[in-house]
Amino acid sequence: MRTDLFDFDLPAERIALRPASPRDSAKMLVVEGGALRDRTISELPQWLKRGDQLVVNDTKVIAAQLKGRRIGRETEPKIEATLIKRLDGSRWQALVKPAKKLIAGDRIRFGNEGKVCLLGHLDAEVEAKGSEGEVTLSFSFHGPALDQAIADLGSPPLPPYIASKRTPDDQDFADYQTMFAANEGAVAAPTAGLHFTPALEQALRERGVGLNRVTLHVGAGTFLPVKVEDTAGHKMHAEWGTISAETAERLNIARHNGGRIIAVGTTSLRLLESAASEDGTIQPFAAETSIFITPGYRFRAVDILLTNFHLPKSTLFMLVSAFSGLETMRRAYAHAIAQGYRFYSYGDACLLFRAGGTEVHDPSPP
């Protein structure tokens, strides 16, 4: 499909720079068939029924944004690195700026004057450079010591559409982490999960809705634009995910008994669909996935999707267009813009019922 079909105009003032407070006070646009209903996240339980199963991503965002200087040569330009993929105990793939200032063999010292990790400076050598500004960094520390050094020196890896407008601060360490965060490895938050609070979780449990955890370590590729003119030419980024045998069995039993699977975020959906067999049975999973979902895809595992509002021409807007229909989503986004919804990572959400899929009962007047 032509990628320009997924383009739309978004006023800059619609991009949220901070999350709603409390988190579950964010707006929620319910999209089912031709109907659009303006609600709030706190009303989510009313749209679900006993036996339904929520699936949340429990990945934890690391402090993947590092600042430092090239050292050992005549000039020492400032370098910014965003860690995007762990390769082994001491090596990471990273996006760096300015990439043109670096060659293989260069050394970078991360940390500012007076800001060092507990074990001292964190140095890295550039092992290799890629064509898209990515480099392979080999660090001076290994394993848990490296993890601690990154935590000491790094900043929250806010998306470019936020970081370009303000500097990340200490509040982002809390704001850019879901209440489910447990397994370190993400360099971007599974943002639909940011809306959840203990009170909302309790209300869902009282409704008889199950809550299930899976892990997909979100990579920085989630922010990368689609640069080709046709979706067939786009290469999707790979991310590591796991679904336990116990979780897979619980979801399969619930669906067999008439319960619906609600993915909290596109990361949970992509993982579930990657793990589903042709008949919709969810299998245990521990692997990378690079699934790229566009209109025409047949969904096998997920009935309902809670997700934020995404960038124009992004793989995530393509995914929601596949889930609910391109024209429906274009109309929903136009409605959201007109009604003052807040977009992207810190923004509001929409609750999508799969096109041609599950029934919905509106619990309140339009």
Curated annotation (Swiss-Prot):
Its EC number is 2.4.99.17. GO terms for molecular function: S-adenosylmethionine:tRNA ribosyltransferase-isomerase activity. Its main location: cytoplasm. Disulfide bonds: none annotated. Pfam families: Queuosine_synth. Keywords: Cytoplasm, Queuosine biosynthesis, S-adenosyl-L-methionine, Transferase. The keyword Translocase does not apply. It is found in: Cytoplasm. One of its GO terms (cellular component) is cytoplasm. It catalyses: 7-aminomethyl-7-carbaguanosine(34) in tRNA + S-adenosyl-L-methionine = epoxyqueuosine(34) in tRNA + adenine + L-methionine + 2 H(+). InterPro entries: QueA, QueA_dom1, QueA_dom2, QueA_sf. It comes from the Bacteria. SUPFAM superfamilies: QueA-like. It is an enzyme of class 2 (transferase). One of its GO terms (biological process) is queuosine biosynthetic process. Transmembrane segments: none annotated. Pathway: tRNA modification; tRNA-queuosine biosynthesis. Belongs to the QueA family. Monomer. Transfers and isomerizes the ribose moiety from AdoMet to the 7-aminomethyl group of 7-deazaguanine (preQ1-tRNA) to give epoxyqueuosine (oQ-tRNA). This is S-adenosylmethionine:tRNA ribosyltransferase-isomerase. It comes from Bradyrhizobium diazoefficiens (strain JCM 10833 / BCRC 13528 / IAM 13628 / NBRC 14792 / USDA 110).
